[in-house]
């Protein structure tokens, strides 16, 4: 501990989300970056709170103003941030619909959400049917520009579309120019529409830089909920640190497809922080991006 540090002691369990150095054995960080962890919690469970659950929590509570009973739509509901959204939304007493492939529907249902098979059904039409034409109060979309346009159609008056990734760029299903046009609509054109709907893009690192105390408070809340036994993240796999490089290449989507419905425990390192940009980041720790567009947007705090 540094000479000016107070409120912490050697041996205390603390959590942080370093942008660089997350795989090292020892790391020097600013004392005001760390959040104390409740005594006795599984450190692997605590890891889950830092990225996936904080992302989900801040989108649900900071980006949106949701009330118990409100309906939301979660894309990629079987993924890391997706399952965090499902569990936290259940705690907030929200009605949840989640798009996922059929192999993940039991996992989605285990969180009390209604699955939508995006491969064999039009999710826009399904939301219209399930909500009797009312739409949902919020959509959380990690897919990308083309999907944002369709998701916006699902938003009810007074609701919000929150983009937080661009997965289809990494799979080649969407071009970079198409994604940038999607950003233009998400952050510009749709905000000018007088239709009572709103849109935004969420990035955990840029928000943390701008609002560090908010970030610490939110992580502390999640750690407390974890310590109280209110949160039980879905498990993909836990790997030793020495296998971290191999873990980065692991097909995360397939891992979640193989989860036993209702299984509970830590996601841990093997979760791989896949959804900082919907899977567009090759390594959050090294800052290596798969597409120049994502690096450009990240550097500008998007």
Q: What function would you assign to each model-found segment?
A:
Residues 268-302:
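Conserved class I S-adenosyl-L-methionine
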Residues 209-258, 262-263:
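C-terminal hydrophobic helical "lid"/dimerization subdomain
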Residues 146-230:
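Glycine-rich phosphate-binding loop and adjacent beta-alpha segment
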Residues 13-76:
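NAD(P)H dinucleotide-binding glycine-rich loop of Rossmann-like/cofactor-binding domains
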Residues 53-121:
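Mid-domain Rossmann-like dinucleotide-binding core that forms the NAD(H)/NADP(H) cofactor-binding site
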Residues 1-19:
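A glycine-/small-residue-rich N-terminal strand-loop-strand element
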Residues 123-133:
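Short amphipathic alpha-helix with an adjacent loop that forms part of the alpha/beta core around
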